[in-house]
């Protein structure tokens, strides 16, 4: 039996252009040819939510993936044709970090913090709480306040701070501590029984 290879790539600024960075002209054709190999299981990895990933796949005519890690690692999908199946086993692993609290309960704890504005519902996920903020040069004070508020409920969290360069907007994602793109990828590789080579 031929061994299976898990090929994972981030989308923005790796496989696809984003912002002012130009696309490498041969990247997609070469990638498409490689991804079509029968021994390849393809995973796209993104900080973005499902709808944006689906749009990027369509817009750039990317090969259909077998798996998608989205929401900065808070979501893991198995893709079968046009059907995206959320991996419940991944959700169970990361949900433990929030100590039984849900998305809305954690959001309520942060409601009084100034300069945080909850992102649209389409950009939220069961295990990802996303906010807009001022594009701070040093977000350390804000991040300390967020950690302090969420420590009240013993939630173990991972804070992801970034700035959208196109809109000059600060972005804060709050995830379970064990949710990350790398951890989701390691979980997927292990669940597929693909050795690390």
Show which residues each predicted segment covers.
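Alpha-helix termination/capping residues and helix-transition junctions
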Residues: 1, 59-62, 191-193
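A general structural motif
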Residues: 2-4, 39, 65, 126, ...
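Asp-based phosphoryl-transfer active-site loop
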Residues: 2-21
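Conserved phosphate-coordination/catalytic loops
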Residues: 21-25, 100, 176-180
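Charged helix-capping and loop-helix junction motifs
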Residues: 24-27, 143-145
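Active-site phosphate-binding/coordination module
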Residues: 25-121
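Conserved acidic, metal-coordinating active-site core of Asp-based
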Residues: 104-197
């Amino acid at each position: 039996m031929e061994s299976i290879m898990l090929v994972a790539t981030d989308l923005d600024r790796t496989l696809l252009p984003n912002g002012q960075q130009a696309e490498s002209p041969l990247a997609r054709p070469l990638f498409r040819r490689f991804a079509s190999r029968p021994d390849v299981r393809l995973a796209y990895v993104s900080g973005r939510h499902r709808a944006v990933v689906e749009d990027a796949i369509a817009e750039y005519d990317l090969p259909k993936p077998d798996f998608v890690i989205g929401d900065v690692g808070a979501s893991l999908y198995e893709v079968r044709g046009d059907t995206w199946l959320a991996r419940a086993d991944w959700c169970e692993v990361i949900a433990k970090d929030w100590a039984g609290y849900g998305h809305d309960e954690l959001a309520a704890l942060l409601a009084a913090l100034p300069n945080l504005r909850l992102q649209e519902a389409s950009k939220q996920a069961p295990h990802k709480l996303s906010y807009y903020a001022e594009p701070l040069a040093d977000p350390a004070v804000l991040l300390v306040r967020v950690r302090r508020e969420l420590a009240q409920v013993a939630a173990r969290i991972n804070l992801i701070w970034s700035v959208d360069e196109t809109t000059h907007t600060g972005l804060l994602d709050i995830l379970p501590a064990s949710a990350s793109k790398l951890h989701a990828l390691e979980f997927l590789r292990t669940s597929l029984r693909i050795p690390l080579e």
